[in-house]
Swiss-Prot record:
Key word Transport present: no
Active site location: 272, 346
Tissue: Ubiquitously expressed.
Organism name: Homo sapiens
Keywords tagged on the record: Aminopeptidase, Hydrolase, Manganese, Metal-binding, Protease, Zinc
UniProt cofactor(s): Zn(2+); Mn(2+)
Top EC category: hydrolase
Protein name (record): Probable aminopeptidase NPEPL1
Enzyme nomenclature, EC number: 3.4.11.-
One GO cellular component term: nucleus
One Pfam family named in its UniProt record: Peptidase_M17
One example of a Gene Ontology biological process annotation: proteolysis
Keyword Coiled coil attributed: no
Residues involved in Zn(2+) 1 binding: 265, 342, 344
Length: 523
C-alpha cells in the first residue's frame, strides 16, 4: 500500500474492469439508486445490467456484505443500512474494512463511493486509512511500480450533482493529512526520533511558507520548560518544543492545537513491561495528527490565527533520566513531584498549553494526545475521549466526530472532585493519581488544564486518542479529520464549512449555555 497514490476525480471515466479493477461501495438503498447508465462503462463488457441487478438483490448487509461481479476484477459492497446514535452516518469504520478486504488487486484501480453529500468528507478520510504509506517489507521495496487508486463519488439524495473541483482538492489535502499522520505514527523510533519529527515539521513549514519556532535541549531548561526537558533529557536525541504559526490579516481569534509528540515511551525509570512497551512508537499520535491537520487546514484557507504546538521528547532510560521523587518546575510556574515517570505525556502537554496561553495569547487551546490506557476502557477503541471546560464545545466535538468519522465521546469534567488525586506534600501537585479507580482519564486531562488554570476564561479542549490512534498493527491517522471538521467554520473551504458543527445547531441545553462562561464562538 505504501506505493499507492489516491486520486479524487469528478468522473473516473470508463474502463474494462479487467484492465482497471473496480469496487463499488455504499449503503444498499443508495446502491439501488445508481442508474445502470452510470456504471455501465466501468463494467462492460464483463458485467451485464441483469448481473448487476442480480448482485444487488443478493446483498444482505449484517452489518456489511459484498458480491463479486466479475472474477476478481469487480466487486460491489454494501455498508450498514443503519447506524446507532453514537456512530457516524457515513459508517466510516466499515468503509475502511471493506476497502481493505474487497478492493481487487491491480496497478490501477477504481473505487466508486455512493453516498449523500454530507458523508463525502468522512468517506474520503475512511478510504485513505486503507492505504498506509509506511512499510519496510523487503518485497515492497522491490516493487517500485507506482500504483493509483482513482476515487469517484456518486452522490444521491438532495445534493446529487457532480462533486465540485474545490471539493476534490479539499479531499486530496485532507486525505494527505490523514496518511501523513499515519505514516509518522507507523514509523519506528530508530527512524522517527525527535530530530526526524522536526524535519517533518520543517518540511510542512517550507511547503506552507512558514518558518517554525523551535526551542530544544538546554534552551528548554533555561527558559523554564521543565516538563518537556525533564521527560526527554535522558534520550540521545534531545527534546523540543516546535511551533508552526499562521497569522492571517483579519483574524478575530487565536487558536492553538497542542500535540503530544512522545516519539517513544519506555515508561522511563517506571519502566513498562515486555508486553506493554511494544507499540509505544505510537505515542506521538497527537502531534502527528496536529501536523497533518495543520497542513490541510492552511492549504484550504484558514481565516483565524492558528498555531500548531508540538511537544517532542523520547521518554528514555539513562543516567540523566528523571527519577520518581524528583520535582520539576514547569512553564506554568507550578511545581510537580514525579511519582510515575510513565505519566509523562501530561508533563510535556502542560508546558505546551502554558506556552499557548502565555506566549501565543490563545483564546481556544486544544490539546490532542495518546494520553492514557484508561481511555480505551472509558470510551472504547473507536471513540476518542473529550474533556473540556465548555459544554458547548463538548457537544461540538461529539457532533464533529459523527460528521467526519473520527468519533468522540465525553469524559466527566469535575475538577473540584477529581483534582485532589494529585495532592503532594512537597510540591504543587504530583503527576499521577493516587486512586486509579477514580476516572483516571479525566484526572490526566485535568492535570493539563491546571497549568492554564481552571478559572481561565478561554476554551480548553482535551482529546485523548490513545485507543483510536491505531487499528491492530496500523496507525489510523485519527484526529486529522476531527480537527478539520471541528474548526471548519474558520475555513475558507465550503466542504469543511459543511462538516463543521455550527454554533446554532449544537445540541446543548439552554441552561447549560446560560451558565457556560466559556462561550468563544464555534469556528
Amino acid at each position: 500500500m505504501a506505493n499507492v497514490g489516491l486520486q479524487f476525480q469528478a468522473s473516473a471515466g470508463d474502463s474494462d474492469p479487467q484492465s482497471r479493477p473496480l469496487l463499488l461501495l455504499g449503503q444498499l438503498h443508495h446502491l439501488h439508486r445508481v442508474p445502470w447508465s452510470h456504471v455501465r462503462g466501468k463494467l462492460q463488457p464483463r458485467v451485464t445490467e441483469e448481473l448487476w441487478q442480480a448482485a444487488l438483490s443478493t446483498l444482505n448487509p449484517n452489518p456489511t456484505d459484498s458480491c463479486p461481479l466479475y472474477l476478481n476484477y469487480a466487486t460491489v459492497a454494501a455498508l450498514p443500512c443503519r447506524v446507532s446514535r453514537h456512530n457516524s452516518p457515513s459508517a466510516a469504520h466499515f468503509i475502511t474494512r471493506l476497502v481493505r478486504t474487497c478492493l481487487p488487486p491491480g496497478a490501477h484501480r477504481c473505487i466508486v463511493m455512493v453516498c449523500e453529500q454530507p458523508e463525502v468528507f468522512a468517506s474520503a478520510c475512511a478510504l485513505a486509512r486503507a492505504f498506509p504509506l509506511f512499510t519496510h517489507r523487503s518485497g515492497a521495496s522491490r516493487r517500485l511500480e507506482k500504483k493509483t487508486v482513482t476515487v469517484e463519488f456518486f452522490l444521491v439524495g438532495q445534493d446529487n450533482g457532480p462533486v465540485e473541483v474545490s471539493t476534490l482538492q479539499c479531499l486530496a489535502n485532507a486525505t494527505d493529512g490523514v496518511r501523513l499522520a499515519a505514516r509518522i505514527v507507523d514509523t519506528p523510533c530508530n527512524e522517527m526520533n525527535t530530530d526526524t519529527f522536526l524535519e517533518e515539521i520543517n518540511k510542512v513549514g517550507k511547503e506552507l511558507g512558514i518558518i517554525p519556532t523551535i526551542i530544544r535541549d538546554e534552551e528548554l531548561k533555561t527558559r523554564g520548560f521543565g516538563g518537556i526537558y525533564g521527560v526527554g533529557k535522558a534520550a540521545l536525541h534531545p527534546p523540543a518544543l516546535a511551533v508552526l504559526s499562521h497569522t492571517p490579516d483579519g483574524a478575530t481569534q487565536t487558536i492553538a492545537w497542542v500535540g503530544k509528540g512522545i516519539v517513544y515511551d519506555t515508561g522511563g525509570l517506571s519502566i513498562k513491561g515486555k508486553t506493554t512497551m511494544p507499540g509505544m512508537k505510537r505515542d506521538c499520535g497527537g502531534a502527528a495528527a496536529v501536523l497533518g491537520a495543520f497542513r490541510a487546514a492552511i492549504k484550504q484557507g484558514f481565516k483565524d490565527n492558528l498555531h500548531a504546538v508540538f511537544c517532542l521528547a523520547e521518554n528514555s532510560v539513562g543516567p540523566n533520566a528523571t527519577r520518581p521523587d524528583d520535582i520539576h518546575l514547569l512553564y506554568s510556574g507550578k511545581t510537580v513531584e514525579i511519582n510515575n515517570t510513565d505519566a509523562e505525556g501530561r508533563l510535556v502537554l502542560a508546558d505546551g498549553v502554558s506556552y499557548a496561553c502565555k506566549d501565543l495569547g490563545a483564546d481556544i487551546i486544544l490539546d490532542m494526545a495518546t494520553l492514557t490506557g484508561a481511555q480505551g476502557i472509558a470510551t472504547g477503541k473507536y471513540h476518542a475521549a473529550v474533556l473540556t471546560n465548555s459544554a458547548e464545545w463538548e457537544a461540538a466535538c461529539v457532533k464533529a466526530g459523527r460528521k467526519c468519522g473520527d468519533l468522540v465521546h465525553p469524559l466527566v469534567y469535575c475538577p473540584e472532585l477529581h483534582f485532589s488525586e494529585f495532592t503532594s506534600a512537597v510540591a504543587d501537585m504530583k503527576n499521577s493519581v493516587a486512586d486509579r479507580d477514580n476516572s483516571p482519564s479525566s484526572c490526566a486531562g485535568l492535570f493539563i488544564a491546571s497549568h492554564i488554570g481552571f478559572d481561565w476564561p478561554g476554551v480548553w479542549v482535551h482529546l485523548d486518542i490513545a485507543a483510536p490512534v491505531h487499528a491492530g498493527e496500523r496507525a489510523t491517522g485519527f484526529g486529522v479529520a476531527l480537527l478539520l471538521a471541528l474548526f471548519g467554520r474558520a475555513s475558507e473551504d465550503p466542504l469543511l464549512n459543511l462538516v463543521s458543527p455550527l454554533g446554532c445547531e449544537v445540541d446543548v441545553e439552554e441552561g447549560d449555555l446560560g451558565r457556560d462562561s466559556k462561550r468563544r464562538r464555534l469556528v
